[in-house]
UniProtKB/Swiss-Prot annotation:
Residues 31-196, 402-404 are mitochondrial matrix. Channel activity inhibited by ATP via ABCB8/MITOSUR subunit. Residues 1-30 form a transit peptide. It comes from Bos taurus. The lineage of its organism: Eukaryota, Metazoa, Chordata, Craniata, Vertebrata. It catalyses: K(+)(in) = K(+)(out). The modification Phosphoserine is found at residue 65. This is Mitochondrial potassium channel. It is found in: Mitochondrion inner membrane. One of its GO terms (biological process) is mitochondrial potassium ion transmembrane transport. GO terms for cellular component: mitochondrial ATP-gated potassium channel complex; mitochondrial inner membrane. The chain crosses the membrane at residues 197-217, 381-401. Its main location: mitochondrion. Residues 218-380 are mitochondrial intermembrane. Keywords: Coiled coil, Ion channel, Ion transport, Membrane, Mitochondrion, Mitochondrion inner membrane, Phosphoprotein, Potassium, Potassium channel, Potassium transport, Transit peptide, Transmembrane, Transmembrane helix, Transport.
C-alpha cells in the first residue's frame, strides 16, 4: 500500500543553523497476506463434548422455562381460588385496617406533642405571672414582663388551637380506623359464611355422587352375577351333550371293531379250510387282504385311543365344572342366607342335592331373581334417601344464602 505523508526534515544551510523544512516523502507499505489456511478438523471427543454442553444448556433453559410456566400457572389458579373464596377482599380489608391504624397512631402522636407544648407554655406563663406579682408596677421590668406575658398568651392560644385541631383529627382517624375494623370483620364473616355454604353444597354433591356410584357398582355386580349364572347354566348342558356325542361315537366304533374282528375270524377260519393246492396261487391275495385288515385294525385302535383320551379330558373338565358350580352354589347359598337370615341351617346341603337331582338350574334362576330384586330394592331405597336429604337440605341452603 502506497501513501503520502508530510514530515519535517532537517536541512543544513551553509553557516546557518539548521532549520526545519517540510518535504513530501512517499512511504510504501506492503501487506503480506497468508495463504489460505485449511480448517482444523475437530476430534470426536471435542464434538461430543460440545454436543454435551449444548444439550446441557438446552435442558437447563427448557427446565427453567417449564418451572416459570408451572409457577405462573399455579399462581394464576391460586389467585382465582382466592378471588372465588374471598381471600383477596379479606386481605385488602386487613391492609386498610393496617393503614388506618398507622394514620391513627400518627394523629395520636401529634396530639401528644401538642399537649406537651401547651403544658410547657402554660408552665412558662405561670412563671411570668408569678414574677409580675412580685414586682411593683413602677419598676422598669414590669413593662417587659407584661409584654412577655402578652406574647406568651398569644402563643398559648395558638398552641391550644393546634391541640384542639389535633384532637379533632385524632377522633376522625379513630372513626376511620373503627370503620376499617368493622369492614374487615364483615368481610371475614362473609368469607366464612361463603366457605360454609360451599362446604355444605360440596357435601351434598359428594353424597349424591356417592349414591350414584354405589348404584352403578351394584348394577355392574348384578350384571357380572347374571353372566356368571348364565355361564353356570349353559356349561353343564353343553358339556353333557359333548360327552353324550363322544360316548355314542365310541359305542359305534366299538361295534364296528367287534364286527371287524368277527369278519377277521371268519376269514381266518375260511382260509384254513382250503387245500394245499390252492395255497400257492392265492397267497398274494391273502397277504394283501391281511395287510388291509391289519391297517384297518391299527387305525381303529388308534382312533379308539384318541376317543378314550378325549373322554378322559372331558371327564376332567366335567369335574372342574362341577367344582365351579358347587362354589357358585355355595356363594348363592351365602347370599340367600344373608338376604333371609331366618332360613334353617339344613339348607346348607341344598347345592349338593340340587346337583345330584339335576335341578340346580332352577335354583340358580331363583337366586338370580332374588338378588336382582334385592339390588333394585336397595337402589330404590338409596334414591329415596337421597331425595329426602336434598329436600330437607334445600330450605336450609335457601335460608343461609338469603341471610348472607
Amino acid at each position: 500500500m502506497t501513501g503520502r505523508s508530510r514530515v519535517l526534515a532537517m536541512r543544513h544551510v551553509g553557516g546557518v543553523s539548521p532549520v526545519l523544512v517540510r518535504r513530501d516523502l512517499f512511504l510504501t507499505r506492503t501487506l503480506c497476506s497468508h495463504g489460505p489456511s485449511q480448517p482444523r478438523e475437530k476430534r470426536p471427543e471435542e464434538v461430543a463434548l460440545g454436543l454435551y454442553h449444548r444439550l446441557t444448556a438446552l435442558g437447563a433453559a427448557l427446565g427453567h422455562s417449564i418451572r416459570q410456566r408451572a409457577s405462573s400457572t399455579a399462581k394464576t389458579w391460586w389467585d382465582r381460588y382466592e378471588e372465588f373464596v374471598g381471600l383477596n377482599e379479606v386481605r385488602e380489608a386487613q391492609g386498610n385496617v393496617t393503614e388506618a391504624e398507622k394514620v391513627f397512631m400518627v394523629a395520636r402522636g401529634l396530639v401528644r406533642e401538642a399537649r406537651e407544648d401547651l403544658e410547657s407554655q402554660q408552665t412558662k406563663l405561670k412563671e411570668v405571672r408569678d414574677r409580675l406579682d412580685r414586682i411593683s408596677r413602677d419598676d422598669n421590668q414590669y413593662l417587659e414582663l407584661a409584654t412577655l406575658e402578652h406574647r406568651m398568651l398569644q402563643e398559648e392560644k395558638r398552641l391550644r388551637m393546634t391541640y384542639l385541631r389535633a384532637e379533632d383529627s385524632e377522633r376522625e382517624k379513630f372513626s376511620l380506623f373503627s370503620a376499617a375494623v368493622r369492614e374487615s370483620h364483615e368481610k371475614e364473616r362473609t368469607r366464612a359464611e361463603r366457605t360454609k355454604n360451599w362446604s355444605l353444597i360440596g357435601s351434598v354433591l359428594g353424597a349424591l355422587i356417592g349414591v350414584a356410584g354405589s348404584t352403578y357398582v351394584n348394577r355392574v355386580r348384578l350384571q357380572e352375577l347374571k353372566a356368571l349364572l348364565l355361564e353356570a347354566q349353559k356349561g353343564p348342558v353343553s358339556l353333557q351333550e359333548a360327552i353324550r356325542e363322544q360316548a355314542s361315537s365310541y359305542s359305534l366304533q366299538q361295534r364296528d371293531l367287534r364286527d371287524l374282528v368277527a369278519d377277521l375270524k371268519g376269514l381266518v377260519q375260511a382260509g384254513t379250510g382250503q387245500g394245499s393246492l390252492s395255497q400257492a396261487g392265492s397267497s398274494p391275495t391273502q397277504d394283501r387282504d391281511t395287510d388291509v385288515l391289519s391297517a384297518a385294525l391299527r387305525e381303529q385302535l388308534s382312533h379308539s385311543r384318541q376317543v378314550r383320551s378325549r373322554l378322559e379330558g372331558l371327564r376332567e373338565q366335567l369335574d372342574g365344572l362341577e367344582k365351579t358350580v358347587s362354589q357358585v352354589a355355595g356363594v348363592v347359598q351365602l347370599a340367600k342366607a344373608a338376604a333371609h337370615p331366618g332360613l334353617e341351617s339344613a339348607d346348607g346341603a341344598l347345592p349338593g342335592s340340587l346337583l345330584e337331582q339335576g335341578s340346580m338350574i332352577m335354583a340358580l334362576s331363583d337366586t338370580e331373581q332374588r338378588l336382582e330384586a334385592q339390588v333394585n330394592r336397595n337402589t330404590v331405597y338409596g334414591t329415596l334417601v337421597t331425595c329426602a336429604t336434598f329436600v330437607a337440605v334445600l330450605p336450609v341452603l335457601y335460608m343461609l344464602f338469603r341471610a348472607s
